[in-house]
């Protein structure tokens, strides 16, 4: 994306660029330098509701399907999964930063409309659930960030209310 922007002639016609990242889907395999950033991080244990008894039996992650949608694999496994997930998010954040920096270098940033959105989150062991298949906050509370062109005078804001694309 950065190479395309660097070589783009903005006087020709407007540029539409859709950038998609395969991460942070499982398996959580971030580049090592990003994982190293979280080596000593205090990673929280998953939230476990007292109603989760049917999933509470501890399972061995080595003997369970890699993409199991639920299971108690223990807090250490959950923290390590989160460490890898956070490292993937940091990797993505850096890549987005590279794209924004390139837009600025090409003097295209102020005219750019940038929309950052994710299709889902991940349960990361909360309530012994994994992946994206549940209507809990971990699956549904995702970023939706819009940076308007500077010519549009849009009042900045933030909401925790549900939003949608139309």
Question: Where would I find each of the regions flagged by the language model?
Answer:
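Active-site-proximal cap/lid insertion segments
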Residues: 2-165
């Amino acid at each position: 994306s950065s190479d395309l922007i660097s070589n783009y002639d903005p006087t020709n016609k407007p540029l539409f660029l859709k950038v998609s990242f395969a991460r942070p889907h499982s398996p959580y395999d971030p580049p090592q330098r990003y994982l190293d950033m979280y080596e000593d991080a205090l990673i929280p244990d998953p939230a476990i509701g007292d109603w989760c008894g049917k999933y509470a039996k501890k399972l061995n992650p080595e003997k369970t399907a890699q993409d199991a949608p639920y299971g108690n694999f223990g807090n250490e496994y959950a923290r390590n999964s989160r460490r890898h997930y956070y490292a993937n998010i940091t990797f993505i954040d850096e890549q987005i930063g590279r794209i924004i920096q390139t837009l600025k270098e090409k003097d295209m940033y102020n005219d750019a409309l940038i929309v950052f959105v994710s299709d889902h989150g991940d349960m990361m062991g909360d309530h012994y659930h994994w992946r994206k298949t549940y209507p809990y906050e971990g699956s549904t509370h995702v970023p939706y960030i819009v940076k308007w062109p500077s010519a549009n005078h849009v009042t900045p804001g933030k909401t925790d209310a549900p939003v949608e694309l139309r």
